[in-house]
């Protein structure tokens, strides 16, 4: 420790304390984009499931850069986004202490995958959730229309209740994820009418986001359990001959105050934290029924976004998907929340038009030599297992 500096930056950021396990596995949207009444009514966020990552090649369109008009290789994340089902609408009124919920109106029919969300043990339950509520529709629906009229009259913020269709994914889970999504654009009356028209109907991801848009990804990070202080906070390892361990903090504070300060790095829970990763550029929004949703103008090969053998620990992506630049929080199969950006980005990276030249669909488990089964068959010929 010779030539030790008297000052050094602290290790680890204090802005994300406490570093504890998230209360819910679903990413919570704590702020929505500012409403613009001149635009048409639309959702501001969407739920999907992280499938995995792959590689793309594109030409950089950035005048002045030494890589302008040259090929670059980038990592992208693929989010499986089956259409969401709208099942309710919530009205909020403004108070001196913030927004307060006015009332909630649910749809008449709810699927079993969303009813499971209201039970801890579905098989032992009587499965009578919302039976009394749906009876209001049988009684000419006057009570429902009164609640919708209250929202139109008093509410200033309108949000819809929508759930995922988890049965369309490779996940074993049967319980859908429910989210409250704010409606932006149009008047309050138009928002309520939009929500009422979409009751029990699906909304696709391409109606929320578009290509080249900058979005935010909200999710719970990958958990690592109880970790030591060196890995958790990035503190420096002590010299080799240190007594009773090297991966520790040598001094955890002064004699007085006679307690350990909250700013001192300590061992504890690492990972499984709620995080918001901002400014991910949308490279592609693919359709699930398109057998060539991974083809480009440069690569005309008819192939899907699912790599050979499927995404590792996930499987095949047969629904609509969103491809965003870089890595996103969470592990595979984890539900992630995609949200419109809270502000308009004016950087060159945000305004750049992205045209993909090639998408890697080789196996993510082995060497990844072939892009399609047809290419493998043409090279290997007929194998003994195929006879």
From Swiss-Prot:
The keyword Ribonucleoprotein applies. Belongs to the universal ribosomal protein uL3 family. One of its GO terms (molecular function) is RNA binding. It is found in: Cytoplasm. GO terms for cellular component: cytosolic large ribosomal subunit. SUPFAM superfamilies: Translation proteins. Keywords: Cytoplasm, Ribonucleoprotein, Ribosomal protein. It comes from Eremothecium gossypii (strain ATCC 10895 / CBS 109.51 / FGSC 9923 / NRRL Y-1056) (Yeast). PROSITE patterns: RIBOSOMAL_L3. The gene is RPL3. One of its GO terms (biological process) is ribosomal large subunit assembly. This is Large ribosomal subunit protein uL3. Gene3D superfamilies: 3.30.1430.10, Ribosomal protein L3, domain 3 (4.10.960.10), Translation factors (2.40.30.10).
């Amino acid at each position: 420790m010779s030539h030790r500096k008297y000052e050094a930056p602290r290790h680890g950021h204090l802005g994300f304390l406490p570093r504890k396990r998230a209360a819910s596995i679903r990413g919570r949207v704590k702020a929505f984009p500012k409403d613009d009444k001149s635009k048409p009514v639309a959702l501001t966020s969407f739920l999907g499931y992280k499938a995995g990552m792959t590689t793309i090649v594109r030409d950089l369109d950035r005048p002045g850069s030494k890589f302008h008009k040259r090929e670059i290789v980038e990592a992208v994340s693929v989010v499986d986004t089956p259409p969401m089902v709208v099942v309710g609408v919530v009205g909020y009124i403004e108070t001196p202490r913030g927004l307060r919920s006015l009332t909630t109106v649910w749809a008449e029919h709810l699927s079993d995958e969303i009813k499971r969300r209201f039970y801890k043990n579905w098989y032992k339950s009587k499965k009578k959730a919302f039976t009394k509520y749906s009876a209001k529709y049988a009684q000419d629906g006057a009570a429902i229309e009164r609640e919708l009229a209250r929202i139109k009259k008093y509410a200033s913020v309108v949000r819809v209740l929508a759930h995922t269709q988890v049965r369309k994914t490779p996940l074993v889970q049967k319980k859908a994820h429910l989210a409250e999504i704010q409606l932006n654009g149009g008047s309050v009356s138009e928002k309520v009418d939009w929500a009422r028209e979409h009751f029990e109907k699906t909304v696709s991801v391409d109606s929320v986001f578009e290509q080249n848009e900058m979005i935010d990804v909200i999710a719970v990070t990958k958990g690592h359990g109880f970790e030591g202080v060196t890995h958790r906070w990035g503190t420096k390892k002590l010299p080799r001959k240190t007594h009773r361990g090297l991966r520790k903090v040598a001094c955890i504070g002064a004699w007085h105050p006679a307690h350990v300060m909250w700013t001192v790095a300590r061992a504890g829970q690492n990972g499984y934290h709620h995080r918001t990763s901002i400014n991910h550029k949308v490279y592609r929004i693919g359709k699930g029924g398109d057998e060539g949703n991974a083809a480009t103008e440069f690569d005309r090969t008819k192939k899907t976004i699912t790599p050979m053998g499927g995404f590792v620990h996930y499987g095949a992506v047969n629904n609509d998907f969103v491809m965003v630049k870089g890595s996103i929080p969470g592990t595979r199969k984890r539900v992630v929340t995609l949200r419109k950006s809270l502000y308009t980005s004016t950087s060159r990276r945000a305004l750049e038009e992205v045209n993909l030249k090639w998408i890697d669909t080789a196996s993510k488990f082995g060497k990844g030599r072939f892009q399609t089964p047809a290419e493998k068959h043409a090279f290997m010929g007929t194998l003994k297992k195929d006879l």
